[in-house]
A protein has these predicted regions:
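Short, basic/aromatic recognition patches
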Residues: 9-25, 54-58
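Conserved Nudix-box catalytic region and its N-terminal flanking loop in Nudix hydrolases
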Residues: 49-72, 77-135
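Generic structural signal for well-ordered beta-strand positions
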Residues: 42-44, 82, 167
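A short coil-to-beta-strand element that immediately follows conserved catalytic motifs
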Residues: 137-149
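Nudix hydrolase/Nudix homology domain
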Residues: 2-17, 97, 101, 107, ...
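Generic short beta-strand
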Residues: 32-34, 71, 188
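Short, small/polar residue-rich loop motifs at catalytic or cofactor-binding pockets
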Residues: 28-30
């Protein structure tokens, strides 16, 4: 039997019209998210068209929560971070700057449900890097993603939409070919730490809430360690941070 939270989300379907949004972004709502509890235990699946209504601010407090990931790609030679600006067509957080790629593992793909060594979210990360940024999956081998932790956060996008996720943080150090999908990505650039801090201080630049939370509490410390732990060839290597992995679900506020 469906939980009260799921029933509430389904009931909301009648009240929101997706036809006013970009057709491709609306089509992607048919993908099935993985629903989890606050301990990141999978409890079912729901297509985004329904799951999206756990993103309605009216429903967020009713308990729907889903699994997500945030990938951070650093250039090996200089440790610069690849950022993207989300496309104007995005339903949530359009035009905001964020980390390299943020999305969801899907129940549609058996491999993306694999929880051993975070394989499912790593496979999903490689898939979405290609979809959003045109980075060939051959350039993002699953074994080179470094998992660091999971965060549980809640954030509004506007008066109607919000976000409520258990988000896996993945670092990757690779030279990649970027050919953005314009329906997903408006712009992209590589930045060093000082340039990113300057962006955060610029009131004209808007960021996604999860990126701001990760940067506030974790990113710059991890980044410092990444730069300190360069290999003998002078390049940064994500796996050098393996000892910093924290497998708790960290509740962010």
């Amino acid at each position: 039997m469906a939980s009260p939270a799921v029933l509430a989300a389904k009931a909301a379907l009648a009240s929101v019209d997706l036809s006013k949004y970009d057709p491709e972004q609306s089509r992607l709502m048919d993908e099935r998210c993985i629903l989890v509890d606050e301990n990141d235990i999978a409890i079912g699946a729901m297509d985004k068209k329904t799951c999206m209504y756990c993103h309605l601010m009216d429903n967020i407090n009713k308990g729907l929560l889903h699994r997500a990931f945030s990938v951070f790609i650093f250039r090996p030679s200089d440790g610069r971070l690849l950022l993207q600006q989300r496309a104007s067509e995005k339903i949530t957080f359009p035009d905001r700057w964020t980390n390299t790629c943020c999305s969801h593992p899907l129940d549609d793909f058996e491999a993306e449900k694999n929880e051993k060594d975070q394989l499912g979210v790593k496979i999903a990360g490689s898939r979405k890097l290609e979809h959003e940024l045109g980075i060939p999956q051959s350039q993002t081998p699953i074994g080179q993603f470094q998992y660091l932790t999971r965060i549980h956060y809640l954030a509004p996008s506007n008066d109607m939409w919000g976000e409520h996720e258990v988000d896996y943080i993945l670092f990757l150090t690779r030279d990649v070919t970027v050919e953005p999908n314009p329906n997903e990505v408006r712009a992209y650039k590589y930045v060093n730490k000082e340039e990113l801090k300057a962006m955060f201080e610029d009131p004209s630049i808007n960021f996604t809430p999860w990126f701001k939370l990760i940067a506030r509490d974790f990113l710059f410390g991890w980044w410092d360690e990444l730069l300190k732990r360069k290999g003998s060839d002078g390049q940064v290597v994500a796996q050098s941070l393996a000892d910093l992995m924290d497998d708790r679900v960290i509740k962010m506020a």
